[in-house]
Amino acid sequence: MTYPATWLLLGVLLLSWPGCGSQPELSPALQQEQYSKQRRELVAELRSDGISSQSVLDAMLKVPRHEFVPASYRHQAYQNRPLPIGHDQTISQPYIVAYMTEAAEIASGEKVLEIGTGSGYQAAVLAELAKEVYSIEIIPELADGARAVLNRLGYKNIEVRTGNGYLGWPEKAPFDAIVVTAAPDQVPQALVEQLAVRGKMIVPVGTGFQQMTIITKTESGVIERKTIPVAFVPMVGKPTP
C-alpha cells in the first residue's frame, strides 16, 4: 500500500487534537444507529487501506470505539485518527489498531499480552479474537478507567493491571502474541522471553518516529522485521524492577 509522503501512519500522537465544536443532541437510539453507521464506514475505509483479515475487520466493526474516548470527542470516535484520552496519552488511530492486530495473527484459543492499556480499546479488539487478554498500564487512572469500561461492556476475557510494562506478566507467560502500544528504545528482553515459540510481538521501536517491528520467536532465536514508520508515545517505565 502506498501513502502520500505527508501522511504518517500515526499510532499514538504526542499532542491533543482539538474538538470540532458542539454537536446536535440525538436520542440514544438514533445516536447508536449513527455510531453503527460510522463504524461500518470506518471498516470500509480500513479495508480499502489494505487491512484484509476478515476476523480483524469484524472485530473493528463490533467494538464501540466511542465508549473508549472522552465524551467531548465521541463525535470524532470513528474518524481514522488518534484522539486524546488524558494524562498526555491518546487512543490509537484505528488503522494502526487494525494493522497491529492483523500482524499479530491471533487465533481463537490463544493468549495475548498487551503493553499499554490506555483507554482499553486495543484490548477489546484483541479480546474479540483471543481466548485471554492480559493488559498492563503504568498510569493507575487509565488502568482503572479502562477496567471499568471493559467490565461495563461485558469483556470477561480481559484482565487489566497497573504495572511496569517492560517487565511483562511472567506468571501468565508464555503468550502467543504480544502487542506493545508505546515505543521502547529497544525491544524489551523480558517480553521476548515471555513470547511463546512461533509467537509474534508487534512493537514500535526507537525514539522520535519509530519503525513498527514484528518479532517472531523460533526454536533457535528470533526473527525481526521492520515495517511501517509510526509515531507512538515513549514507553514509560524501566527494563529492570
Residue ranges and their predicted role:
Residues 7-16:
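Bacterial N-terminal signal peptides
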